């Protein structure tokens, strides 16, 4: 009876999801030698120079090198709206240029090692996880679900059908033929409002649900900033 009880408990646990949470360090580890064209991906340290945004920010008087500090200040002052918009466009353009190398990456191996009940939630804007997912779909459809907690450059939305598409560039919905909208990127203000965007809110609500009964939680390459209260409270 005890053994049967243990087996039942094991089966119950086995059916619970493995939740994997990814940060910038995971994408760095995925392409340690650079992407398909040898481009290294940047973490937040040195981000301003790596994005070539030094000239864009020359019109402001910020001394901080921290992107979150800079973006938070830009968001507070209407006179910096043009600079902020250029910064946002630079971020989206920068991450949209990355392509996976031909050989399998950590992301490919991660996705293939998980099951359909499992979850991979990422804070990253870059398309590497999505590109790995699309590549793995050529092998199997039994892949984990993906959640994008800060949005992603490779996610397009059909607002009419409430469907998402994994692709880098805008196209048209296969159902209603309406033009797709780029997923909003949640930029690094000190007080993030995860409820302002319906898609982002949905991603966070789903993550909290899966975390509530997860069997295993793995955090890879992520260290929650003290200012990101929502992430810290997870």
Walk through the language-model features, giving the residues of each:
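Gly/serine-rich nucleotide phosphate-binding loop at the start of the catalytic core
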Residues: 1-129, 138, 225
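Metal-dependent nucleotidyl/phosphoryl-transfer cores and adjacent nucleic-acid-binding surfaces
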Residues: 14-16, 41, 53, 158-162, ...
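Glycine-rich anion-binding loop/nest that anchors nucleotide
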Residues: 19-25, 121-124, 179-234
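Short helix/loop capping segments that flank catalytic or ligand/cofactor-binding pockets
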Residues: 29-31, 129-132, 156-159, 166-168, ...
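Short glycine-/polar-rich loops that comprise or flank the Walker A/P-loop
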Residues: 116-118, 143-144, 215
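Short, aromatic/basic amphipathic alpha-helical patches
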Residues: 132-138, 233-234
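A short alpha->loop->secondary-structure connector
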Residues: 136-147
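Cys/His-rich short segments
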Residues: 148-199
